[in-house]
Amino acid sequence: ALPLIGSLDQSNLAQIDRAVAMLLAARPRKVAVLGLAFKPGTNDLRESPILDVIAQLQENGIDISAHDHFVTPDNVVESARHAASTKPGLQDLCQQLPQLLQEDIESALQGADAVIVTHALPEYRKAAQEVFVPVVDVARLFSGQAEPENCQGIGW
């Protein structure tokens, strides 16, 4: 079973790199992240690949704003602390999360030149359809239906 786990790590890293490359191709000054937690319905950031994406975007000088229904101003500090303990390389980012987190989707999208969606929620699908900037969809928002022209999907 160990080789499979190792290949999963490589696959996850490749997906992270692919998402970053797709976002960088849009040459954004600011990226909105819709969905921070490892999966929808939780505030657990510990295994969340989007944190690695955000860190790489910031290394490229890109501003970030984010929204998550379950990672809220009330729990983000605690959630980020847990994530930083499992991913030491992301400690700086985890300390910044309270400033990056927006209370509503509209605030997160304001001024964004690109969007990445990590949770397949109806309100995130609606936002992806309504923005006029590139959207990287890692949540398979439009699975089985036509994807809007501004969306590129890569599920992870």
Annotate each predicted stretch with a short phrase:
Residues A1-W156:
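Structural/interface elements that position substrates and couple domains in central-metabolism enzymes
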